[in-house]
């Protein structure tokens, strides 16, 4: 299939791997963060880390929308279903994220909450049309990729006068999170997390373009290469980052030119700006409170804001102490560093959010990488 098969071509990937081995300087270590969970999944699925030279290391970032959702936000959705009698609609992965009191949306549903999995906000709108006597809340999460559909859903609800529909808006923003990582003590002070550059997200960049990454690439001297999700995309992006580091450059480059432009999708951006605005701050799992890193519904559209309609008050809840999800989201640790990975915490029984979604670092490592952690002993045959 055009635009897919050629980006999964093993011969091309091997040629790029050869170039990386030739161009990665022997006396230097390279450390690049793939921000997006889709890239984390691709790196694990296609064994990309094994194709890289030993001195080129990939670090998982917080780009999985389900993973960065804090417990307190899940608690609000559960509260709406169990205490307020609302129909809560959300995406499938969100249903299994652990919340307080050993609950999740799935377990709250088992307790009698009317919680439904949907594929889009349009599905939630249809439920609101069919059940006008019930309050219907769309629990909207995700990065800039899923934000325009949420804004469109709110606009359609207003046009149709659906007074029983509202949105619990938990959309988050990529550039603010990357800046927060670069300002973190692990990167700036202690050197615990050496970062030489970023593999920029694909779908997010289709919406926002490459321009929003330019300020911190210049300010922090960290190159960014936007890449598609196929293995050749990722390999080429890593090669481009190595070349930038070797040449002392720190600019934004676009490997994913078949889908991403500098300005992004202006129509989608205008729709989001019409309905949503930036929050002063928002808690991310693993990162804590991140300034200007999320969106809320504008005052003009407050009739469709579930937080305002139900008088919800957010309460921060600490993560399970045994779970290393926060450190993994910051790039400080890897899934194998967590003591409960693969024992207490599995995809069937996730303790942390990183094990829930296929884009989570722990779930990806469970599916494609956990057997690499097992030491292999070669025994001489008699």
Feature names for model-found ranges:
Residues 1-133, 147, 157-160, 168, ...:
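Metallocofactor- and cofactor-centric catalytic cores in central/energy metabolism, strongly enriched
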Residues 14, 122, 143-147, 171-172, ...:
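Conserved structured core elements
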Residues 6, 67, 139, 143, ...:
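Hydrophobic alpha-helical scaffolding
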Residues 139, 143-212:
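Phosphate/pyrophosphate-binding betaalpha-module
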Residues 188-261:
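A conserved active-site cap/scaffold subdomain adjacent to cofactor or substrate pockets
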Residues 51, 108, 152-160, 215-219, ...:
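Alpha-helical structural signal in soluble globular domains
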Residues 58-64, 165-172, 225-229, 255-258:
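A generic structural motif
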Residues 236-327:
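Internal helical hairpin/lid segments
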């Amino acid at each position: 299939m055009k635009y897919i098969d050629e980006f999964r071509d093993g011969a091309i990937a091997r040629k790029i791997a050869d170039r990386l081995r030739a161009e990665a300087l022997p006396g230097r270590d390279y450390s690049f963060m793939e921000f997006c969970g889709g890239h984390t999944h691709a790196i694990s699925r296609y064994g990309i880390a094994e194709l890289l030279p030993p001195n080129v290391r990939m670090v998982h970032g917080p780009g999985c929308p389900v993973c960065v959702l804090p417990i307190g936000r899940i608690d609000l959705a559960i509260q709406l279903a169990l205490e307020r009698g609302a129909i809560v609609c959300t995406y499938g992965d969100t249903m299994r994220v652990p919340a307080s009191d050993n609950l999740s949306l799935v377990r709250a549903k088992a307790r009698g909450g009317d919680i439904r999995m949907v594929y889009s906000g349009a599905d939630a709108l249809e439920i609101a049309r069919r059940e006008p006597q019930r309050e219907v809340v769309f629990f909207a999460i995700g990065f800039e990729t899923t934000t325009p559909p949420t804004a469109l859903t709110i606009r359609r609800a207003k046009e149709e006068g659906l007074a029983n529909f509202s949105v619990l808006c938990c959309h988050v923003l990529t550039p603010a999170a990357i800046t927060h990582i670069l300002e973190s003590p692990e990167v700036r002070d202690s050197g615990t997390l050496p970062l030489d550059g970023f593999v920029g997200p694909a779908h997010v960049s289709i919406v926002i373009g490459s321009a929003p990454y330019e300020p911190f690439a210049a300010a922090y001297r960290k190159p960014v290469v936007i890449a598609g999700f196929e293995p050749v995309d990722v390999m080429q992006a890593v090669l481009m980052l190595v070349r930038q580091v070797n040449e002392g450059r720190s600019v934004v480059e676009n490997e994913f030119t078949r889908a991403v432009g500098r300005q992004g999708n202006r129509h989608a951006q205008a729709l989001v700006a019409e309905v949503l605005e930036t929050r002063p701050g928002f808690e991310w799992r693993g990162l804590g409170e991140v300034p200007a890193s999320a969106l809320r519904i504008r005052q003009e559209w407050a009739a469709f804001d579930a937080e305002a309609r139900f008088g919800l008050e957010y309460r921060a809840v600490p993560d399970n102490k045994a779970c290393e999800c926060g450190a993994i989201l910051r790039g400080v640790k890897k899934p194998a560093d967590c003591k409960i990975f693969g024992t207490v915490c599995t995809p069937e029984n996730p303790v942390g959010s990183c094990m829930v979604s296929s884009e989570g670092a722990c779930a990806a490592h469970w599916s494609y990488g956990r057997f690499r952690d097992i030491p292999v002993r070669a025994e001489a045959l008699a």
